Amino acid sequence: MQLPSVFLDSLKGTKGFDQTTFEKLHVSGEQITSIRLNPSKSPIGNHQPCLPAGRLPIENKIPWTEQGYYLKERPSFTFDPLFHAGCYYVQEASSMFLEQALKQTVDLSKPLRVLDLCAAPGGKSTHIQSLISPGSLLVSNEVIKSRCNILKDNIIKWGCENVVVTNNDPKDFAKLENYFDVIVVDAPCSGSGLFRKEPDAIEHWSENNVALCSQRQQRILADVWPSLKEDGILVYSTCSYSKEEDEDIVKWMNEKFLAANCQLLISENWGITKTDNSFRFWPDKVKGEGFFITVFKKVHHEDDHKTRVTKRLNEISAPQTELVKPWLTNSGDKLFVHGFDGIYMINKDFQPDINLLYSNMRVAYFGVKLGELMKAKLVPAHSLAMSRLLADSVMKIELNREQAIRYLQKKDIDVEKSQPGWQLICFNNHPLGWVKVLQNRLNNYYPMELRILKDN
């Protein structure tokens, strides 16, 4: 791998940059694979986090995150049913430092409104969701519609019920003044931190592109800043090494918005480079890709402008509610409403927030879609199968690995005859989706758009 000389020259003098070891690492071809476990996905009836050790080549723990692990090699995640069950997320190790940024600056035990502004494909959103309290609401946003669909799929797979997925430009959030307690901006960037992982990105790097990215990052931050509360926290990160997208942005935020910098404590053993009030991850010093992260606190308060609620979600009827309740383990604090294409469930406390977002944003998904009512019966949605709130009494069919892969390919599966009706397909007690057992056959209801296309 040949790194452009103009790129290397641009990094000279940057704290932590060692050209010799940096170039050597990129030539070595070494690849790092890491995962983050889903602490809420555990065998049905057992609420202990599941580490699929024996199934994945776990090497050791990532030191700055509770649920992160390095793998000895990269397996075929496509053919691991536990991946499709949402038991873990394949995520770059350096970016998991977000956990330290949040834990050290925010009381995560309190109910919070959190915005993940540039959220697709969902790594940071699923991470945030695992860290915040059940009474907190996460708005997970992606401006590009196709990527927003991928984000929605990953949110559903994670089993979240306190997340709203939106498809908005950052400027749209200016309408929600002083609304969020925490905003995470993993900004679009020139991508130099991923050169080792994605060598083709080298061809697209240029000084001009760095300048364009810096301007776009400033626009994004200026657009979203009004929606942050006074004393709120904004976490800014990139996968770029260029100071124009990193330290220069910090200086710009300090000067333009009087944003204060938050201090974080890190271990010297982690190999992370501290630059003023920010942190750089150099791949020749840490076991991860290139990454930059900093944390701002809003100390200047803008005047409030009341955001109007013009739309409200309509609750389903009492008889319909009685048809839905048996599918759920606990529905006491839940509200059942008519959504885009069926019945959705939300936490009652979130109703004002979701009505506000529904009135002012392009909401793509919220809460948990339960399904559709047909002939006074619920046709369950895939998202209900993925939800942690599904009742233990729901009938289940346990599959072996070969059967599970066939199910995920949306092929016919041979299982022992079972009681007719909707049944939950499981692998190692982890739900994968639905089948409907009929008298002479079994219908596979795994979503067509999620099916495995490759042969094992």
Predicted features along the sequence, with ranges:
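Mobile active-site "lid"/loop adjacent to the S-adenosyl-L-methionine
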Residues: 146, 185-223, 239-247
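Short Gly/Ser/Thr- and charged-rich N-terminal loops/segments
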Residues: 50-57
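Conserved class I S-adenosyl-L-methionine
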Residues: 111-118
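A short acidic, Gly/Pro-enriched loop at the edge of an enzyme's catalytic core
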Residues: 175-182
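C-terminal catalytic and target-recognition region of SAM-dependent MTase-like enzymes
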Residues: 239-342, 350, 433
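S-adenosyl-L-methionine
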Residues: 152-175
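Helix-to-beta-strand junctions that scaffold the AdoMet/dcAdoMet cofactor pocket
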Residues: 133, 228-229
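Polybasic, low-complexity RNA-engagement segments
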Residues: 1-38, 299-456
